[in-house]
Amino acid sequence: MIGAGSWGTTFAKILADGGNDVVVWARRPELAREIDEGKRNSDYLQGINLPRSLRATSHLGEAMRGAEQVFVSLPSQTLRSNLDAMIPYLGPATVVISLMKGVEKGTGLRMSEVIAQGLPIDPEQIAVVSGPNLALEIAREQPTAAVVSSVSPATAVAVATSATNRYFRSFVNTDVIGTEFGGVLKNLIAVAIGIVDGVGYGENTKASIITRGLVEMTDFAVAYGADPQTLSGLAGLGDLIATCESPLSRNNTAGRLLGQGYSFTDVVKQMDQAAEGLASVTPILSLAEARGVEMPIVRQVSQVLAGTLAPKDIAPHLTTDDEPQGERTRGERTTDDGQGQGRTSVWGSLKRAFDQLRDGGGSSRRDRP
């Protein structure tokens, strides 16, 4: 496990509780020592006892030596700078798994794309994990699920097998684009939810933004080649609900501080860990413009961050149009002949997401256990 923040440590716990031999790499020696000897991470997971089998080190080579699977949980904007140091310790068949939910500034690349550029490994050796995964809840062993995605079904299954235990279940799919963009885009909607929460707006406003936000997410992801059903599952709607509704979400918290009147600079100073949504707004809008995708919610979040839109003015703009229009609850990709493709209803999204969480069955066609 490369990274010892809240999510990296929690996922290391998931893997260790599943019977795997796990070593965490922490940048700070004192944190590595606390995890290794005290089985605690008081900086990021206060009150959580870590598995006795879990080990930690501040030496990257020691952590990676002989590893069949390397999970990476670092701030998305620091990923590329850390990849070179990993190269000497990669085995010929090592699988690298991204736990990150962001896009790289400047390039707009997803984390799996950054890994593919920075490491000398085949695409079949790269996987991503996403879903409704608030770290502290999982560290407390509250049951949940996630999706493991890779272009190689065998790789996805191997990683999902490692990342399954009595309180955490992993499904699989091969839609890496949809799985990653679902995790990225829901962060932006969660910032919007936090803003209106900080302003003091109620549940009607938040429900409107979540519903319209899912349409924006699906439109964007489908424009870049995703299967719309992926956005209906755990990596899309499931993650969106969890992130928007929980005070444990860093993106929700960042938005709430903005809504309460704090500046973008002040919010960044107050956050003890990165809120990936803040860094992803600008590159996502650039990608949306490149494909002609309208994202009014994300655009207004950008305006709030820039200080050109007052937080109290965000909700009316998000939930109304200049003229009455039909409600579109389907993500659509328009082809050259004008026909809409890849449609998915909000009701269908809800049904598939809840089906996936039922023990032992009812998963969507795209996310298979």
UniProtKB/Swiss-Prot annotation:
One example of a Gene Ontology biological process annotation: phospholipid biosynthetic process
Catalyzed chemical reaction(s): sn-glycerol 3-phosphate + NAD(+) = dihydroxyacetone phosphate + NADH + H(+); sn-glycerol 3-phosphate + NADP(+) = dihydroxyacetone phosphate + NADPH + H(+)
Region Disordered, residue ranges: 312-369
Residues annotated for sn-glycerol 3-phosphate binding in this entry: 101, 131, 186, 239, 249-251
Disulfide bonds listed in the record: none
Keyword field: Cytoplasm, Lipid biosynthesis, Lipid metabolism, NAD, NADP, Nucleotide-binding, Oxidoreductase, Phospholipid biosynthesis, Phospholipid metabolism
Residue numbers binding NADPH: 6-7, 27-28, 101, 135, 250, 276
Keyword check for Cytoplasm: yes
Active-site residues, Swiss-Prot/TrEMBL: 186 (proton acceptor)
Keyword Cytoplasm included in the entry's annotation: yes
SUPFAM superfamilies for the chain: 6-phosphogluconate dehydrogenase C-terminal domain-like, NAD(P)-binding Rossmann-fold domains
Pathways involved: Membrane lipid metabolism; glycerophospholipid metabolism
Chief place where the protein resides: cytoplasm
GO terms for MF: glycerol-3-phosphate dehydrogenase [NAD(P)+] activity; NAD binding
Entry EC no(s): 1.1.1.94
GO terms under cellular component: cytosol
Localization terms from the record: Cytoplasm
Sequence ranges of Basic and acidic residues compositional bias: 325-336, 352-369
Protein family: Belongs to the NAD-dependent glycerol-3-phosphate dehydrogenase family.
Role: Catalyzes the reduction of the glycolytic intermediate dihydroxyacetone phosphate (DHAP) to sn-glycerol 3-phosphate (G3P), the key precursor for phospholipid synthesis.
HAMAP family on file: NAD_Glyc3P_dehydrog
Name assigned to this protein: Glycerol-3-phosphate dehydrogenase [NAD(P)+]
Organism: Leifsonia xyli subsp. xyli (strain CTCB07)
Organism classification: Bacteria, Bacillati, Actinomycetota, Actinomycetes, Micrococcales
